[in-house]
Amino acid sequence: GIHAALATWPAVQAAIQRGETPIVAVLGAGSMGLCAIAGLRRYVPQVRIIVGARYPHQQAFARSLGADVVVPAAELARAVRRESGGHIVGDYLSGGCHATIDAVGSSDSIMDCLKFTRPRGRVVLLGMPAVVSLDLTGLWHRETALIGAYTYGTESMPDGTKRHTFDLAIETAADCQLNRLVSATYRLDDYQNALAHAAGAGRRGAVKIVFDLRASDARNKKETN
């Protein structure tokens, strides 16, 4: 999420240089989307953050992490239009966000991001790669930058310094108390229930499901003794 947040900086910087208030939309508020929101608010504080989240608990977390506008995912395009003052031209907004982070990863979500990112804006794809089908006509006509953000690297910070993503993630996790995103822990040998919980995390009111290897190690030692 931190990596994706900082990938918006070129578009944000260009908006600031033009005297505009930079707008960044985040589509999806699972663990990756929420971490992107935290990264934006911490490291790119100039932005106005608009979030589309499917579930009420995701919406609440998004607000607590610093999002300015939070709406159900289906209403994100309308919220972007209202905040940016853009108009619908065909399937696209005439204005829209300066940058958008897609934290869903489906064909529909990527197309939505392309539609409400302004011309010469930037769409950042966050998460695991997959095969998708897209109509890229608007990308060419509007000269949109489509950027992938995967895991980590050496980040170019807005102040010109270089930082490692892991260092930034550790700082953000502590300062934003991201441990509250952990909804349940499981022993490693209880992986079937853990995976089932993770698969239905959103509708079950959960965000992040994790394994507690300490519990598994303690049990193994006890059985060995």
Residue ranges and their predicted role:
Residues 81-86, 90, 94, 133-184, ...:
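C-terminal substrate-binding/catalytic core of Rossmann-like NAD(P)-dependent dehydrogenases/reductases
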Residues 23, 121-122, 145:
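Short glycine-centered segments of the SAM/dcSAM-binding site in methyltransferase folds
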Residues 101:
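N-terminal Rossmann-like NAD(P) cofactor-binding module of classical short-chain dehydrogenase/reductase
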Residues 1-78:
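Mid-domain Rossmann-like dinucleotide-binding core that forms the NAD(H)/NADP(H) cofactor-binding site
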Residues 30-32, 107-108, 130:
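Residue-level detector of alpha-helix initiation sites
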Residues 115-133:
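ADP-ribose/adenylate-binding Rossmann-like module
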Residues 52-55, 127, 150:
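N-terminal Rossmann-fold cofactor-binding loop
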Residues 88, 111, 164-225:
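C-terminal hydrophobic helical "lid"/dimerization subdomain
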